[in-house]
């Protein structure tokens, strides 16, 4: 833009006197000057902005380094706190395991001492038995050695007798065999001499007869051979004289025929090769034409298929992007709720761990060794508890277990995303089989390491809870029994004091023990006291059986609760 400046005096006169061309030149110069000034201003602004940008980049780089350092410090402190908490949890677990192992070692030491005592007793009894067996074996060996010596003596005598008889028989048989061999050798030599003489005489006779026949046949064959040679020579000369010209002609024609046949064979081979090559190329051209036509058709079909697949894939990708965006929105909305739920569960878990650590101080030695109590193992065979206490404890445990299971299931469902809840709408699907989805990761059995079903996750917790509930029920029953027994004892003591003291209350009491009417009042009171004592003894025995069935093991665990039986024998004089 052209900036307006102050008007110069006399400029109007100059402008009035200037021509159109000068005016045009002046306006162009003013426009160029304005453009140059504007360009300089823009360049200065650009340089200032670039310097400001570089300065901001340096500041941002330095601030980023500071922020990263500060963030590293914060993360390091958070990580240190997290590691401290983990170390504290690990140390608590380690202490718990150490206590449990110490208790196990003490129990094993006691078992080892008992086993060593049993072993020493068994060794002593075994050595006594072995000594008795050795004595018996030595006696048996001496008897067997004597029997063996007697048998050996008898066998040696029998052997010598049989050996003498066998040697004598062998000598006699050997002498007889020598005589028989000498007689047979003499007879064989005489027969061999006679046969050899007969063989030589027959051999000489046959040799003379064969030589005479050979000479006669040789003379006859020589005459026949000479006559045949003469006749063959005459026939051969006559044949050669008659067939010499035809033989020469035949040889010449044979050579010409061989040359012509060779030439014809070469031409035929060449012609066959050309025909085969022509047929091969025709077949190859037709085959290539069909092949390339099929390839072109296949390429066109593949092009159409790829085009349709591309369109379908593009539409599916668009739909997938839209679905993923929607799922991302749902995930971002559900993540905050899940994080809040997890924080609440983490607080509950920390509270549970704190309570467990506090409760661990009050655990007995048996509970440290066997932390998860099994009611089937705790109740010994042949003992029965109080039926009312057992029924009440089972009813309370059955009422509490479903509620706790439902709460745990609801908590697990709340921590799951909506997709997972849609896939597993009910607890029946989650526990139907191994292929069904589950609310949480697998739980493992601490003893065998096998997978635990989802419905059995809180089994160990309910074991300890039921044990504590049964202990509490037994203690309440024992407390009520002791209160009733205390009241009965107070009543008996009051009656006894009333019977031995004289005061206004006793005299004003309608049932006065000092008053005897026909000697029946004291008898009635005595029978009543005996019946009350029998009822108290029966209740005490029932409460004792219930306590033993609940606590189990009796004196085996050093920290088990001991039930106290109080027996009071009141005698009214």
From Swiss-Prot:
It is found in: Cytoplasm, Cytoskeleton, Flagellum basal body; Cell projection, Cilium, Flagellum; Cytoplasm, Cytoskeleton, Flagellum axoneme. The keyword Coiled coil applies. Keywords: Cell projection, Cilium, Coiled coil, Cytoplasm, Cytoskeleton, Flagellum, Methylation. GO terms for biological process: axonemal dynein complex assembly. Component of the nexin-dynein regulatory complex (N-DRC). Interacts with DRC4 and DRC5. Disruption phenotype: Defects in DRC2 give the ida6 and sup-pf5 phenotypes characterized by reduced swimming speed, disruption of the assembly of several other N-DRC subunits and destabilization of the assembly of several closely associated structures such as the inner dynein arms and the radial spokes. Its main location: cytoplasm. Belongs to the DRC2 family. The keyword Cytoplasm applies. Asymmetrically dimethylated at Arg-96 and Arg-142 during flagellum resorption. Probably methylated by PRMT1. This is Dynein regulatory complex subunit 2. The modification Asymmetric dimethylarginine is found at residues 96, 142. Component of the nexin-dynein regulatory complex (N-DRC), a key regulator of ciliary/flagellar motility which maintains the alignment and integrity of the distal axoneme and regulates microtubule sliding in motile axonemes. Plays a critical role in the assembly of N-DRC and also stabilizes the assembly of multiple inner dynein arms and radial spokes. Coassembles with DRC1 to form a central scaffold needed for assembly of the N-DRC and its attachment to the outer doublet microtubules. It holds the Pfam family NYD-SP28_assoc. Residues 15-231, 258-359, 470-501 form a coiled coil. InterPro entries: DRC1/2_N, DRC1/DRC2, DRC1_C. It comes from Chlamydomonas reinhardtii. One of its GO terms (cellular component) is axonemal dynein complex.
